[in-house]
Amino acid sequence: MRSGAQSCGSPASSWAEDALLEAFLVSTLVVAIGEIGDKTQLLALILAARFRRPVPIIFGILFATLFNHALAGLLGGWIRAAVAPDVLRWGLGLSFLAIAAWALKPDKMDEEPVAIGKYGAFAVTFVAFFLAEIGDKTQIATVALAARFDSLVAVVAGTTAGMLIADVPAVFLADRASTRIPFKAIRYVAAALFAAMGVAALAI
């Protein structure tokens, strides 16, 4: 007969599951809020208005984000393994505070990132989103989150889910969404969230 300890999950297993869930939920929340009003959300509005084909646009966003954030997450994991804990703590704290300040600045699309040409909605969206995310605050946040949490899969899944939560409604609402979303208020919420994470990292 199996003992109660064997039949129930061990404390270590429960802790690991909680850590994975925390990494996923925090990553989702941070990126979903930070993405609202970001240039990639504006890009989703532009592509949706241009193509009027939401499904390939959404798949383009999904795969571009997975690819881009997986690379960012790998970098964050390497930083976590290579950097001393005290240096990592200060680096993460200051990074989140810097992203908080960055979140207060409105994004805009200065020019068309990818010419439409003969390419389809999926290809244009994939390339445009991948390029737009390079150096963007959500990519930098993914690096920091992957360095903060010891779970690449949970972080990348969370940041990708956050991107979709913010961008999919924009695809379906197209240009009507941009006039109704309180971007300024949401930027302040995003900045406060990043700042709180920065303070928490420094206080550990």
What is each stretch, according to the model?
Residues 131-142, 195-204:
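Hydrophobic alpha-helical transmembrane segments in multi-pass integral membrane proteins
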